[in-house]
């Protein structure tokens, strides 16, 4: 259920882009993102900082897109979100001296501190790379190509990177039974 809630706004965006246009799809994305937060609250699911950042950026860039009737702003939202995530991860490493990924997953998965740091830097680079690729596609490709990249390209690339992250974590996991 949580996975469906996670992707429902982007699925709705894609469907309404195909049925109408980028502006209708943007409005649907805005409403869908608000409904996502409300559903998480009703289902007593955790609402993370990432959810709030995405909500704020969707509302800001969506509103400007609709007010100015300029799709450039909603296209930039993707890059802004990925840069914000990269900055939050980097900020955690710099100011808290601890990987934010470790803070989220460290209770369940035991890795050496160096592995957590490398993993966090990998995610920072990944987010910045996605932001840059989005900027390129938004600027030089058609609107339809950008929508397809946003929905399918980013999802596919993220899935592959997440699977790679899982393999990395498995390879570096500390077996607590053999440590005793």
Curated annotation (Swiss-Prot):
UniProt cross-references to Pfam families, sorted A to Z: IspA (PF04279)
Matching InterPro entries: YciB
Coiled-coil intervals, chain numbering: none
GO CC list: plasma membrane
Keywords of this entry: Cell inner membrane, Cell membrane, Membrane, Transmembrane, Transmembrane helix
Domain of life per record: Bacteria
Membrane topology of this protein: Multi-pass membrane protein
Membrane-spanning ranges: 10-30, 47-67, 74-94, 121-141, 151-171
The keyword Cytoplasm is annotated on this UniProt entry: no
Subcellular compartments: Cell inner membrane
Tagged with keyword Membrane: yes
Function comment: Plays a role in cell envelope biogenesis, maintenance of cell envelope integrity and membrane homeostasis.
Family per record: Belongs to the YciB family.
Protein name as catalogued: Inner membrane-spanning protein YciB
UniProt organism field: Idiomarina loihiensis (strain ATCC BAA-735 / DSM 15497 / L2-TR)
Lineage start: Bacteria, Pseudomonadati, Pseudomonadota, Gammaproteobacteria, Alteromonadales
């Amino acid at each position: 259920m949580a996975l469906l809630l996670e992707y429902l706004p982007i699925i709705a965006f894609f469907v309404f882009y195909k049925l109408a246009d980028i502006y209708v799809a943007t409005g649907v994305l805005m409403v869908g993102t608000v409904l996502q937060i409300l559903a998480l609250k009703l289902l007593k699911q955790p609402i993370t900082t990432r959810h709030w950042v995405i909500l704020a950026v969707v509302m800001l860039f969506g509103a400007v897109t609709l007010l100015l009737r300029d799709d450039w702003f909603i296209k930039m939202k993707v890059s802004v979100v990925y840069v914000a995530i990269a900055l939050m991860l980097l900020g955690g490493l710099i100011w808290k001296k601890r990987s934010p990924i470790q803070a989220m997953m460290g209770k369940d998965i035991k890795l050496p501190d160096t592995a957590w740091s490398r993993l966090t830097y990998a995610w920072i680079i990944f987010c910045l790379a996605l932001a840059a690729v989005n900027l390129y596609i938004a600027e030089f490709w058609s609107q339809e190509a950008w929508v397809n990249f946003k929905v399918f390209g980013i999802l596919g690339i993220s899935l592959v990177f997440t699977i790679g992250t899982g393999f990395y974590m498995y390879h570096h996991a500390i077996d607590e039974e053999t440590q005793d």
